[in-house]
């Protein structure tokens, strides 16, 4: 399936130069003062693991790999693998931790994830778009900080660092985007 360069998202798997590449970083859309707009994409080769930065014109169309998606439940870690169970057929599979890279810390027991297969081989794991996590470390609340739009650093229960509004305290639960690890809102 062909997609425009502007439609490329983190986690997409592209067929580029006869290889499969996963988009590992949020693509940067750039409109220079002179010349045409382009999209800067950081990709990782699924066979070799090499990373590459590629610049595509906004007018370019790329081949997105046709993948089969299945829901799996994360059960536990086994060495360097994740053990996942198919939610329909209850089959278990082992997948390398490397597939999730820095997003591994978002994974929690019994979380439902989407595993993408290409020719019956697992290629990618998609986490839910957002997760709810507790703030374990942050600076104290500054009185009257609800009126300001400034952010302060916070460390979450899984060790990830995010910027949160000034009014949030240790122990509060927040919603965090899994694709770019940013604060969304206070959990309800």
From Swiss-Prot:
CDD domains: S1_EF-P_repeat_1. InterPro entries: Elong-fact-P_C (IPR015365), NA-bd_OB-fold (IPR012340), Rib_uL2_dom2 (IPR014722), Transl_elong_fac_P/YeiP (IPR020599), Transl_elong_KOW-like (IPR013185), Transl_elong_P/YeiP_cen (IPR001059), Transl_elong_P/YeiP_CS (IPR013852), Transl_elongation_fac_P (IPR011768). It holds the Pfam family EFP. Pathway: Protein biosynthesis; polypeptide chain elongation. One of its GO terms (molecular function) is translation elongation factor activity. GO terms for cellular component: cytoplasm. It is found in: Cytoplasm. GO terms for biological process: peptide biosynthetic process. Keywords: Cytoplasm, Elongation factor, Protein biosynthesis. Involved in peptide bond synthesis. Stimulates efficient translation and peptide-bond synthesis on native or reconstituted 70S ribosomes in vitro. Probably functions indirectly by altering the affinity of the ribosome for aminoacyl-tRNA, thus increasing their reactivity as acceptors for peptidyl transferase. Belongs to the elongation factor P family. This is Elongation factor P. It comes from Rickettsia africae (strain ESF-5). The lineage of its organism: Bacteria, Pseudomonadati, Pseudomonadota, Alphaproteobacteria, Rickettsiales.
């Amino acid at each position: 399936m062909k997609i425009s360069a502007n439609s490329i998202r983190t986690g997409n798997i592209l067929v580029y130069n006869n290889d499969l590449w996963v988009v590992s970083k949020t693509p940067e859309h750039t409109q220079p003062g002179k010349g045409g707009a382009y999209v800067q994409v950081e990709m990782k080769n699924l066979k070799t693991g090499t990373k590459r930065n590629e610049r595509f014109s906004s007018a370019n169309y790329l081949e997105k790999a046709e993948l089969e998606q299945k829901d799996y439940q994360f059960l536990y870690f086994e060495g360097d693998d994740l053990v996942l169970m198919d939610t329909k057929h209850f089959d278990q599979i082992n997948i390398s931790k490397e597939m999730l890279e820095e997003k591994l810390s978002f994974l929690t027991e019994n979380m439902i994830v989407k595993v993408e297969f290409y020719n019956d081989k697992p290629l990618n794991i998609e986490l839910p778009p957002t997760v709810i996590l507790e703030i374990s470390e942050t600076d104290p609340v500054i009185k009257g900080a609800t009126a300001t739009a400034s952010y302060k650093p916070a460390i979450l229960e899984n060790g990830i660092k995010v910027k949160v509004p000034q009014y949030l305290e240790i122990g509060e639960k927040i919603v965090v985007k899994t694709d770019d690890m940013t604060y969304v809102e206070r959990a309800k």
